[in-house]
Amino acid sequence: MSVSFGAEVVDGGTRFAVRSATPVTLCLFDDAAERQIPMTGADGVWHAEIEGVSVSARYGYRAAADPAKLLVDPYAIQLDRPFHYDPCLGEPGIDTTALVPRAIVTPPPNAPVAPPLFTPGGLIYELNVRGFTMLHPDVPEAQRGTIAALAHPAVIAHLKKLNVAAIELMPIVAWIDERHLPPLGLTNSWGYNPVVPMAIDPRLAPGGVAELVETVAALRSAGIGVILDLVFNHTGESDRLGPTLSLRGFDDPLYYAHAPDGSLVNDTGTGNTLDCSRPEVRALILGSLRHFARCGVDGFRFDLATILARGPGFDPHAPIFAEIAADPLLASRVMIAEPWDIGPGGYQLGQFPDHWLEWNDRYRDDVRRFWRGDGSAGELATRIAGSADLFGPGDTRTVNFLAAHDGFTLADLVSYAERHNHANGEDNRDGHGDNLSWNNGVEGPSDDPAIRQRRGDDLRALLATLFASRGTIMLTAGDEFGRTQQGNNNAYAQDNAIGWVEWQNRDRDLEAFVAALAAFRAANRLDAVAPYADADWRALDGEVMTPDRWHDAPGFELRLADGDAQIALRIDRQTRRVSLSRRTIVESR
């Protein structure tokens, strides 16, 4: 018999179920009072049905392994407060009742599960909810930093101007700060340190999951889909010194991968790794995906997605892929992999199932190299044409991007040769050291008109290349108008002006340029994922491009037939120019 985990409202009360290796006590909270009720269990699953308990009741659990630790239901839908790190959370035997959020009994969402609006080839717009809206002048101050702000007419108008097909929300489920951040006076603002996989962080949705449902509906009515970035590779319980908040307290050996010596596997760089080879872990992941599908979202981006398919190594036929494909709620959703982790054999670009899209860092790096001046035109052409060397000769599954939340913003890419992460408190050691960036002669801000012109030309060349590329493309919020993080390429802990999108002084000329690119791409069907039917590659002098010319060529021209017209893409590194044009084909008689 299948088990309905979490808190399920039934006639006259609520039914609770949780998985645990040791006996569990249900804790019901009424203001400061706590009522403890032993649960009954079999085969590691513990149950209780309590009369008179209904929607809005607050609860938690205590497991016999350490009853001092209040634990959050892994299947919780709503929490009464955010997580805040405290050293006591990781100390065995110390009571954490005052430190841990309570779950709130909440009915599941039931939005219509319509087909996704997003189709491959469209523009994905990656954003951080807080960072995107905290400084938005048109959003009411009380609404800034929340999911509801994304439904504001001014936000939707901006997205429509760019022809955004779907926004991709960086993690929204409840997370906790890494333990080194509070002593530095910093907080994690990106959310890639989740505790439970379904409950939205109360800072982003004070009214709970209903706010996500309403925002998704508003965006869908404007023709914009929503993709959620979900983290199923680790949790914020971290390493052996980390906090005990949920899974660790219930059954550490079940949920987390361990080496033969009993130590935690760390293929994520965060201290622990979820063991997705276990059916119980996959059931939790699938439960989260179904929950958010019922909120109306188009699909999901999987952080460090190689973890999903790890045995000891990566298995392209791992059970979770078939389970997602067979699920009636999930089979039609958009699935996007970040196709790597830091474990052995973790880099798996091109190896995910045929219906999954994949972040293509080869595209990012080859385009950057070309415009920096040390890459080949041949590699650039391969990336623009859909990366058939990675995804095969058919429809491409690439997600092309130049910048993402990790790394430099696009404006910083052409303004800084080195990272400047001192504000993160790690002596500038964190973040990637090799960014394939360049500063155009001066590190950081410059008032020199010539340098500013070169940087502007580089930005336009990069952006035009992106919008001319075959396959799905992704733009990170603010890159369309020159957002800077002051050279910080790892702004995960900058919940301040460094990490927030600055709207007032944005480069409106660049923004208009990107809007024009988006319009040209849509009008001329450059968003195709199918292979080019009739591609004519030319050197800049008009001659046919030959294999021996690709490596040292300063650019090329690609001509694509489109009915009675021809689309021409001309890339010239010497002049820092990308030209896109449509012209009528004149037949000679």
Where are these regions (language model features)?
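The feature marks proteins involved in alpha-glucan
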Residues: 1-11, 40-45, 49-126, 133-142
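Glycan-recognition and catalytic regions of carbohydrate-active enzymes
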Residues: 3, 452, 459-487, 500, ...
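Structural beta-strand segments of beta-rich domains
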Residues: 12-16
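Conserved, mostly hydrophobic/aromatic
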Residues: 18, 61, 127, 169, ...
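Short proline/glycine-enriched turn/loop motifs at strand-loop junctions of beta-rich domains
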Residues: 19-24
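Core domains of carbohydrate- and sulfate-ester-processing enzymes
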Residues: 59, 63-111, 179-185, 193, ...
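Conserved alpha/beta catalytic core and glycan-binding cleft of carbohydrate-active enzymes
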Residues: 76, 89-93, 99, 104, ...
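Substrate-binding/active-site clefts of carbohydrate-active enzymes
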Residues: 128-297, 305-326
